[in-house]
Amino acid sequence: MCTHTEPSRSFYAELQALERGAVTSLSFTPGFPAADFPECGPLVFGYGTDAGQLSRGVDALYERVVLNERDWSIEFLSASEAVVEAMRLSRAGGRPVVIADTQDNPGAGAASNSTGLIHALVAHRAQRAAVGLFWDPQAVNVAHEAGTGASVELVLGAASGHPFAGRFVVESLSTGRCHCDGPMLKGATVELGLTTCLRIDDVRIVVTSTRVQMMDRAFYRVAGVVPEEMKILVNKSSVHFRADFEPIAQAVLVAKSDGHMAADPADLPWTALGNGMRVSPGGRPFENTKRATDSASRCA
């Protein structure tokens, strides 16, 4: 969930409006789902000099979260659905449609080498599409040995369990050193390692030898891809890319394709949550059977 989108945007606006007088600070932490411990979950808290006013502010925010709980669910599209919708939107021309390949986000611990969206782009014959950043050092080495303009047979994502095999054109080669101008990295120089742009049909894949999530348009440009000229951009990231890409995007879609970081917390193998904590907005409550068994054993 991004704070730029609803319901986060209006919720945090209300939170800021309540920070007045004796209420020094209010906070809402939705909870980082890749953390399996009893206290994991959303929390509203605050600091102030008047306990009554502070409690009213915290209670108001808590009630808003609970009453509108299901609004915090994210609509995920399958890889095929996301590509079809992006192609439909892009027919109007203008700015690119961005697809977040959220479950293959290396910033959350994924491998950045899943091919579900590449399969979908090629299958649906997407035009002027680009994917980044795809981590495959072996493919990068083959491309650099073959040279720019060469045609190479490759199996991308061989270690992912769902590889993509095909003949690619090596469109560009790079050292992967790039200067970033976006608001996330603010002028930093980033080393992506040896990098290449591989094209199959009209789909371009920026492949790197270092695992980095897509968060700056410079990560495309270093491989010769101009993101503003693409119809579809598939970013292996969840939220960090938005600061630099939303200004050029006509829409941002979130795809639930193959990848190692479950985007829906209900899909995670919880073991240690507090009893009764719902595993997703409006979802089933967690029941810690192990803790109940341990307690029964101690009582016995």
Regions found by a protein language model. Give the residues of each.
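Hard-cation-handling environments
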Residues: 1-202, 206-207
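Extended hydrophobic packing segments that form well-structured cores
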Residues: 44, 66, 182-300
